[in-house]
Protein backbone atom coordinates (compact mmCIF):
# COMPACT_ATOMS: atom_id res chain seq x y z
CA UNK A 1 0.00 0.00 0.00
CA UNK A 2 1.26 3.51 -0.79
CA UNK A 3 -0.32 4.62 2.51
CA UNK A 4 1.25 4.37 5.93
CA UNK A 5 -0.69 2.61 8.69
CA UNK A 6 -1.40 6.04 10.22
CA UNK A 7 -2.73 7.43 6.92
CA UNK A 8 -4.93 4.36 6.46
CA UNK A 9 -6.38 4.83 9.95
CA UNK A 10 -7.11 8.52 9.30
CA UNK A 11 -8.85 7.66 6.02
CA UNK A 12 -10.87 4.77 7.45
CA UNK A 13 -11.90 6.69 10.59
CA UNK A 14 -13.28 9.65 8.67
CA UNK A 15 -14.82 7.54 5.90
CA UNK A 16 -16.84 5.59 8.50
CA UNK A 17 -18.68 8.85 9.30
CA UNK A 18 -19.30 10.02 5.73
CA UNK A 19 -22.86 10.29 4.44
CA UNK A 20 -22.15 9.18 0.87
CA UNK A 21 -25.45 10.42 -0.58
CA UNK A 22 -25.21 13.92 0.94
CA UNK A 23 -21.50 14.43 0.29
CA UNK A 24 -21.60 12.86 -3.18
CA UNK A 25 -24.53 14.99 -4.33
CA UNK A 26 -22.87 18.07 -2.87
CA UNK A 27 -19.54 17.30 -4.58
CA UNK A 28 -20.94 16.67 -8.07
CA UNK A 29 -23.27 19.69 -7.83
CA UNK A 30 -20.32 21.88 -6.86
CA UNK A 31 -18.27 20.58 -9.80
CA UNK A 32 -21.08 21.48 -12.20
CA UNK A 33 -21.66 24.90 -10.63
CA UNK A 34 -17.99 25.90 -10.33
CA UNK A 35 -17.20 24.56 -13.83
CA UNK A 36 -20.53 25.00 -15.69
CA UNK A 37 -19.06 23.83 -19.01
CA UNK A 38 -18.74 20.35 -17.45
CA UNK A 39 -22.53 20.06 -17.56
CA UNK A 40 -22.25 18.86 -21.17
CA UNK A 41 -21.27 15.42 -19.83
CA UNK A 42 -24.65 15.23 -18.10
CA UNK A 43 -27.03 16.80 -20.63
CA UNK A 44 -29.16 13.64 -20.55
CA UNK A 45 -29.87 14.35 -16.83
CA UNK A 46 -32.41 17.04 -17.71
CA UNK A 47 -32.66 20.73 -16.87
CA UNK A 48 -29.41 22.36 -15.68
CA UNK A 49 -29.70 25.93 -16.96
CA UNK A 50 -29.16 27.51 -13.54
CA UNK A 51 -27.20 26.66 -10.40
CA UNK A 52 -30.53 26.00 -8.65
CA UNK A 53 -31.44 23.51 -11.39
CA UNK A 54 -28.19 21.66 -10.70
CA UNK A 55 -28.70 21.69 -6.93
CA UNK A 56 -32.23 20.29 -7.25
CA UNK A 57 -31.57 17.80 -10.05
CA UNK A 58 -32.27 14.35 -8.61
CA UNK A 59 -30.19 12.61 -11.28
CA UNK A 60 -27.16 14.75 -10.34
CA UNK A 61 -27.70 13.92 -6.66
CA UNK A 62 -28.03 10.23 -7.48
CA UNK A 63 -24.96 10.18 -9.72
CA UNK A 64 -22.98 12.10 -7.10
CA UNK A 65 -23.85 9.38 -4.61
CA UNK A 66 -22.68 6.75 -7.11
CA UNK A 67 -19.41 8.63 -7.74
CA UNK A 68 -18.65 9.00 -4.04
CA UNK A 69 -19.57 5.35 -3.38
CA UNK A 70 -17.01 4.47 -6.04
CA UNK A 71 -14.46 6.72 -4.31
CA UNK A 72 -15.34 4.79 -1.16
CA UNK A 73 -14.35 1.58 -2.92
CA UNK A 74 -10.83 3.02 -3.08
CA UNK A 75 -10.95 3.30 0.71
CA UNK A 76 -11.64 -0.46 0.84
CA UNK A 77 -8.82 -1.21 -1.64
CA UNK A 78 -6.02 1.11 -0.52
CA UNK A 79 -3.48 -1.55 -1.50
CA UNK A 80 -4.73 -1.85 -5.11
CA UNK A 81 -6.51 1.32 -6.20
CA UNK A 82 -5.24 1.10 -9.78
CA UNK A 83 -6.40 -2.48 -10.25
CA UNK A 84 -9.74 -1.69 -8.71
CA UNK A 85 -10.39 1.25 -11.07
CA UNK A 86 -9.13 -0.36 -14.31
CA UNK A 87 -12.67 -0.99 -15.62
CA UNK A 88 -13.93 2.50 -14.70
CA UNK A 89 -10.90 4.08 -16.36
CA UNK A 90 -11.64 2.20 -19.59
CA UNK A 91 -15.34 3.12 -19.41
CA UNK A 92 -14.70 6.85 -18.90
CA UNK A 93 -12.12 6.89 -21.68
CA UNK A 94 -13.84 4.76 -24.34
CA UNK A 95 -17.55 5.28 -23.70
CA UNK A 96 -17.98 8.60 -21.90
CA UNK A 97 -14.95 10.44 -23.39
CA UNK A 98 -14.41 12.27 -20.12
CA UNK A 99 -11.32 14.49 -19.95
CA UNK A 100 -9.12 12.92 -17.27
CA UNK A 101 -8.46 16.38 -15.79
CA UNK A 102 -11.99 16.08 -14.35
CA UNK A 103 -10.86 13.31 -12.00
CA UNK A 104 -8.41 15.71 -10.32
CA UNK A 105 -10.97 18.51 -10.17
CA UNK A 106 -13.62 16.28 -8.62
CA UNK A 107 -11.10 14.78 -6.19
CA UNK A 108 -10.28 18.26 -4.91
CA UNK A 109 -13.96 19.13 -4.60
CA UNK A 110 -14.62 15.89 -2.69
CA UNK A 111 -11.91 16.95 -0.24
CA UNK A 112 -13.52 20.39 0.23
CA UNK A 113 -16.91 18.76 0.82
CA UNK A 114 -15.52 16.25 3.34
CA UNK A 115 -13.91 19.15 5.21
CA UNK A 116 -17.17 21.10 5.23
CA UNK A 117 -19.26 18.14 6.37
CA UNK A 118 -16.71 17.04 9.02
CA UNK A 119 -14.89 20.19 10.19
CA UNK A 120 -13.81 18.78 13.56
CA UNK A 121 -12.39 15.51 12.21
CA UNK A 122 -10.85 17.07 9.11
CA UNK A 123 -7.45 17.89 10.60
CA UNK A 124 -4.45 18.81 8.45
CA UNK A 125 -3.19 15.22 8.77
CA UNK A 126 -6.54 13.83 7.61
CA UNK A 127 -6.64 16.37 4.79
CA UNK A 128 -3.16 15.28 3.66
CA UNK A 129 -4.17 11.59 3.73
CA UNK A 130 -7.31 12.28 1.65
CA UNK A 131 -5.35 14.48 -0.76
CA UNK A 132 -3.01 11.54 -1.32
CA UNK A 133 -6.00 9.21 -1.78
CA UNK A 134 -7.61 11.58 -4.30
CA UNK A 135 -4.32 11.74 -6.25
CA UNK A 136 -4.14 7.94 -6.39
CA UNK A 137 -7.77 7.64 -7.47
CA UNK A 138 -7.34 10.28 -10.20
CA UNK A 139 -4.17 8.54 -11.43
CA UNK A 140 -5.92 5.15 -11.47
CA UNK A 141 -8.88 6.55 -13.40
CA UNK A 142 -6.48 8.15 -15.90
CA UNK A 143 -4.51 4.96 -16.71
CA UNK A 144 -6.39 4.28 -19.97
CA UNK A 145 -5.63 7.80 -21.20
CA UNK A 146 -1.86 7.35 -21.42
Swiss-Prot record:
The organism's taxonomic lineage, starting at the top: Eukaryota, Metazoa, Chordata, Craniata, Vertebrata
What is one cellular component GO term in this UniProt entry? blood microparticle
What is the organism of origin for this protein? Paleosuchus palpebrosus
How does this polypeptide assemble, per the annotation? Heterotetramer of two alpha chains and two beta chains. When oxygenated in vitro, exists virtually only in polymeric form. When deoxygenated, forms tetramers, octamers and larger polymers.
- Descriptive protein name: Hemoglobin subunit beta
Q: Which residues cross the membrane?
A: none
Against CDD domains, the record matches this protein to: Hb-beta-like
Provide the alphabetized UniProt keywords: Heme, Iron, Metal-binding, Oxygen transport, Transport
Mention any additional remark.
Displays a pronounced Bohr effect despite the lack of the His at position 146 conserved in the beta subunit in most other vertebrates. Shows chloride-dependent sensitivity to organophosphates like ATP and 2,3-diphosphoglycerate (DPG) but not to inositol hexaphosphate (IHP). Binds molecular CO(2), not bicarbonate as reported for other crocodilians.
Spell out the family assignment given in the record's similarity comment.
Answer: Belongs to the globin family.
Top-rank lineage group of the source organism: Eukaryota
Q: Which residues form the Globin domain?
A: 2-146
Amino acid sequence: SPFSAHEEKLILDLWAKVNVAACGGDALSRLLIIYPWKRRYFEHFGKMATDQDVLHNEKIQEHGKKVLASFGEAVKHLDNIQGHFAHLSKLHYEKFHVDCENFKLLGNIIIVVLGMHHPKEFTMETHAAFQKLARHVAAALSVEYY
